[in-house]
Amino acid sequence: MGVARLRELLPDYAKDLRLNLGSVTSQSQLNNQQLWGTVLTSAIASRGATTLTELEAEALEHLSPEAAKAARTAAALMAMNNVYYRTLHLLEDKEYSRMRAGLRMNAIANPGVDKVDFELWSLAASAVNGCGMCLTAHEHELRGRGVSREVIQDAIRVASVVHAVAVTIESHEQVPATA
């Protein structure tokens, strides 16, 4: 189940991912809640059914119901915010950036867990979703709260590995490689 099962499902050509998945979930500067919340948020953001099923089951062994809800909330809000703010960043007409967003995001103010944890999870989802504007905002908030670059890097590493695992497993399940 979980990490072990995903490592078994990864094809031989993804041996590095197999090793990285083991490393990022066992050797981290993130505390247990930060780590498994980052794993869950990243799995949701990565949109891989098998990866989400496996990692969610394991994450729920490590997270309180409140933390699991907050991780899901971070993934949901970032799915919206990352599209919106990435689009504003990419549009040539910067007037859009000065307009009121008009999007509800009350959970960011009161996520039900430590604000640092929620910010780390939002950062991870933003990394998966590729929103530079959001990444900068979350990194700035975390650094302002005294979080080290090493901790931030660990959250980004978890997100990148979980995303790569999801992409690889889902594509391999759809079209098994011959080599």
From Swiss-Prot:
SUPFAM superfamilies in alphabetical order: AhpD-like (SSF69118)
EC class (word): oxidoreductase
Pfam family, one: CMD
Gene Ontology molecular function, alphabetical: alkyl hydroperoxide reductase activity; disulfide oxidoreductase activity; hydroperoxide reductase activity; peroxiredoxin activity
Keywords, comma-separated and alphabetical: Antioxidant, Disulfide bond, Oxidoreductase, Peroxidase, Redox-active center
Enzyme Commission number: 1.11.1.28
Active-site positions on this chain: C131 (proton donor), C134 (cysteine sulfenic acid (-soh) intermediate)
GO BP, one annotated term: response to oxidative stress
Disulfide bonds: C131-C134
Signal peptide: none
Transmembrane segments: none
Function (record text): Antioxidant protein with alkyl hydroperoxidase activity. Required for the reduction of the AhpC active site cysteine residues and for the regeneration of the AhpC enzyme activity.
Entry-linked PANTHER family: ALKYL HYDROPEROXIDE REDUCTASE AHPD
Assembly and oligomerization: Homotrimer.
Protein name per the record: Alkyl hydroperoxide reductase AhpD
Gene responsible for this protein: ahpD
